[in-house]
C-alpha cells in the first residue's frame, strides 16, 4: 500500500497516511485563548486531484495566504456549508497516525496576545510596553495640553487626555470587531492581516472623517441648561463618563462580549444626570429610543442577513456553474452597495440629481473595477462558455428543491473554491470600508467628552457645541489602534467563531446586511446600534442554516451584557463623579 503525503491544517505539520484514499484532517485550533471548545479532529475524504501543486488562480483561491485562516481548510468549509457528505466516512485512527510535535507546540503556554498573533511572548510584551510609553509621553507634546497655562491646569489636562485615551483604547478593543470579526471568522483575512488593515483604516477614518464639532451633552440624552454655570461639576461628569464607559467596555472585552460603545456613553451620562441634575436632566424619550434599539437592531440585522444568505444559496449555489454565477453577482452587489452608501452617507451636493449622479457614477466605477479584478484573477476558468456535464457533476450537487427558502446543496471542489474566492474578496472590501467608517464615526464617543472637558479646563464656553482640535482627533485614532492591537482579538473571536461558524459567503451576507441596515435605518431616523445589528446579522446567517447552528450560550451571554450596559455605566458614572468631585475640591 503506497503511503499518501498530506499536510495538516494545523501549523503546516506533515504526516503520512497509509490509506487508499487521501484525507484532509480538520482541526479546530485554539487560536484565541478564551475559546473553550476542545481541539476537534475529524476527517473528510478528498480526491487526490483536488490538491494540485500549481493553483490555477493563486490570488483569489482561499488556500492562498490572502484567504487562509488557521481554523479550517477549504474542505471543512465545504462540509460546513451543507454540501453532501460521504455516507461511509473512514475516520483516521489517532493512535496509529500521531502528529510529531515540534517546538511550535509550546505556543499554548504563551499569553493571550502572543498566542493570538503567533508571536513570541517577548515580542508581545515589547509591543505593549511601546504602546504604553507612547500613551504616557505623547500628551506632553500636544497643543491641547494647554501650553502657557498653569501647572495645575496642565496636570488636569494630562489626566483628561489619558481618560480619553482609555475610552478610545476600549473602543478599539471591543468595537472594531464590527468591521473585522466576520472576515477573520470566515477565513477571508487572518487575524494579523485584519488587525494591520484595521489599524491603518481606523486611524485614517478618525483623522480624516472624525467630526470636528461635538455636543457637550452626548447623543441628546441630557438637558444642557441644567448644568449651565456648573463648570467644575460638568468637568467631573464628563471625565467620569469616559472612565465609567471605558471600565465597562474593558470588562466586556475581557469576556469577549460585543457591546455598544454608544450605549456605554449613554448609560454613563444618564447616571451622572440623574445623580447631579435630577429626573428632569434626562431626555427620557431619547433614552427610550436607545433602549428600543436592543430589539430593533438585531432583528433587522438577522432578517436581512437571512434573506441575503438564502439569496446567495438560491441563485449562486444552485446555478449550473456556481463560480461564474458568483463572479457575475459580485459587480451587482458592489454597485448596489457603493451606490447606496455614496448617496446616503457621502453626498457631495445637497441637490438630489447631483447626489444621485455622483452615487451612480461611483457605483458603476466600483462594479467595473471589481469585475476586472475578478476576471483577471480567475483567468480561463471563467472564460469557458459552458462546463461539461462531467465537470458539473463533479463540481456541484444537484438540487432537489427549488423554493427560495429551501435548503440547497452547494458547490464542491474547484467550484467551491471559486465561490469562496469571489465572496472572500468582496468581504475584505466591505470590511475595509466599515473599518474606515467606524474610525470616523465612533471615535466621537471618546473624543467628544474629552474635547468638551478640555474646553472647560482652558476657559472655553461650556455651551452645547465644542470644536475638536486635530491633535485630539489623532489622539483618539491612536487609542483605537492601540486597543485593537492589544485586546481586539477577544471580541473578534466572539463575532467570528463563537456565535456560528462562518465562511466567506456567510461572512459577506452578515457584513453586507449589517452595513445596509445601519446605513438606511440611520437615514430613516430609526434607533440603531451597529454592534447589535452585526451580532443579529451573524445570528441570521446561522438561522438560515438551522436553529441548531447558533450557539445559544454565546447569544445568551451577549444579550445579558447588552441589558446591563446602561445600568452598569450609570452606576459607575455616579461613583466616579463622586470621587472626581472630591479630588477636584482639593486641587482647584
Where are these regions (language model features)?
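Alpha-helical transmembrane segments and immediately membrane-proximal extracytoplasmic
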Residues: 2-588
Amino acid at each position: 500500500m503506497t503511503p499518501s503525503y498530506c499536510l495538516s491544517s494545523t501549523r503546516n505539520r506533515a504526516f503520512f497516511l497509509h490509506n487508499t484514499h487521501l484525507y484532509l484532517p480538520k482541526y479546530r485550533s485554539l487560536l484565541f485563548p478564551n475559546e473553550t471548545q476542545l481541539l476537534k479532529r475529524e476527517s473528510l475524504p478528498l480526491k487526490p486531484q483536488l490538491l494540485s501543486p500549481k493553483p490555477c488562480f493563486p490570488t483569489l483561491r482561499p488556500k492562498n495566504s490572502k484567504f487562509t485562516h488557521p481554523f479550517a481548510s477549504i474542505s471543512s468549509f465545504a462540509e460546513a456549508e451543507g454540501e453532501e457528505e460521504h455516507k461511509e466516512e473512514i475516520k483516521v485512527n489517532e493512535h496509529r497516525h500521531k502528529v510529531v510535535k515540534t517546538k511550535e507546540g509550546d505556543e499554548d503556554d504563551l499569553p493571550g496576545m502572543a498566542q493570538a498573533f503567533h508571536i513570541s511572548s517577548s515580542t508581545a510584551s515589547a509591543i505593549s510596553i511601546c504602546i504604553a510609553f507612547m500613551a504616557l509621553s505623547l500628551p506632553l507634546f500636544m497643543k491641547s495640553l494647554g501650553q502657557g497655562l498653569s501647572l495645575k491646569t496642565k496636570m488636569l489636562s494630562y489626566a483628561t487626555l489619558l481618560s480619553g485615551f482609555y475610552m478610545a483604547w476600549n473602543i478599539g478593543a471591543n468595537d472594531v470587531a464590527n468591521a473585522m470579526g466576520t472576515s477573520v471568522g470566515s477565513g477571508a483575512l487572518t487575524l494579523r492581516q485584519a488587525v494591520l488593515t484595521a489599524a491603518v483604516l481606523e486611524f485614517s477614518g478618525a483623522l480624516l472623517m472624525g467630526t470636528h464639532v461635538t455636543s457637550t451633552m452626548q447623543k441628546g440624552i441630557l438637558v444642557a441648561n441644567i448644568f449651565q454655570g456648573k463648570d467644575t461639576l460638568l468637568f467631573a461628569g464628563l471625565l467620569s463618563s469616559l472612565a465609567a464607559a471605558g471600565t465597562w467596555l474593558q470588562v466586556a472585552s475581557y469576556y469577549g462580549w460585543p457591546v455598544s460603545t454608544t450605549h456605554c456613553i449613554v448609560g454613563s451620562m444618564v447616571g451622572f444626570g440623574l445623580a447631579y441634575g435630577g429626573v428632569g436632566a434626562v431626555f427620557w424619550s431619547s433614552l427610550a429610543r436607545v433602549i428600543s434599539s436592543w430589539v430593533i437592531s438585531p432583528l433587522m440585522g438577522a432578517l436581512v442577513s437571512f434573506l441575503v444568505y438564502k439569496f446567495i444559496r438560491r441563485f449562486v449555489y444552485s446555478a449550473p456553474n456556481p463560480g461564474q454565477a458568483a463572479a457575475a453577482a459580485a459587480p451587482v452587489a458592489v454597485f448596489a452597495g457603493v451606490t447606496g452608501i455614496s448617496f446616503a452617507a457621502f453626498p457631495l451636493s445637497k441637490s438630489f440629481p447631483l447626489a444621485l449622479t455622483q452615487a451612480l457614477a461611483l457605483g458603476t466605477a466600483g462594479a467595473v473595477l471589481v469585475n476586472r479584478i475578478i476576471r483577471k484573477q480567475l483567468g480561463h476558468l471563467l472564460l469557458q462558455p459552458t462546463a461539461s456535464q462531467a465537470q458539473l457533476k463533479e463540481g456541484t450537487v444537484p438540487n432537489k428543491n427549488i423554493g427560495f427558502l429551501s435548503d440547497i446543496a452547494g458547490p464542491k471542489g474547484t467550484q467551491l473554491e471559486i465561490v469562496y474566492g469571489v465572496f472572500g474578496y468582496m468581504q475584505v472590501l466591505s470590511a475595509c470600508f466599515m473599518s474606515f467608517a467606524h474610525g470616523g464615526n465612533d471615535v466621537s464617543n471618546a473624543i467628544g467628552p474629552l474635547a468638551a472637558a478640555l474646553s472647560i479646563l482652558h476657559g472655553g464656553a461650556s455651551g452645547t457645541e465644542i470644536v475638536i482640535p486635530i491633535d485630539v482627533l489623532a489622539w483618539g485614532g491612536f487609542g483605537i489602534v492601540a486597543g485593537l492591537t492589544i485586546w481586539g482579538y477577544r471580541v473578534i473571536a466572539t463575532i467570528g467563531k463563537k456565535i456560528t461558524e462562518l465562511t466567506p459567503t456567510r461572512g459577506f451576507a452578515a457584513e453586507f446586511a449589517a452595513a445596509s441596515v445601519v446605513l438606511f435605518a440611520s437615514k430613516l431616523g430609526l434607533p440603531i446600534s451597529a454592534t447589535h445589528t452585526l451580532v443579529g446579522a451573524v445570528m441570521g446567517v446561522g438561522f438560515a442554516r438551522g436553529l441548531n447552528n447558533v450557539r445559544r450560550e454565546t447569544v445568551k451571554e451577549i444579550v445579558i451584557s447588552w441589558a446591563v450596559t446602561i445600568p452598569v455605566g450609570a452606576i459607575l458614572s455616579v461613583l466616579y463623579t463622586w470621587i472626581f468631585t472630591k479630588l477636584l475640591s482639593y486641587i482647584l
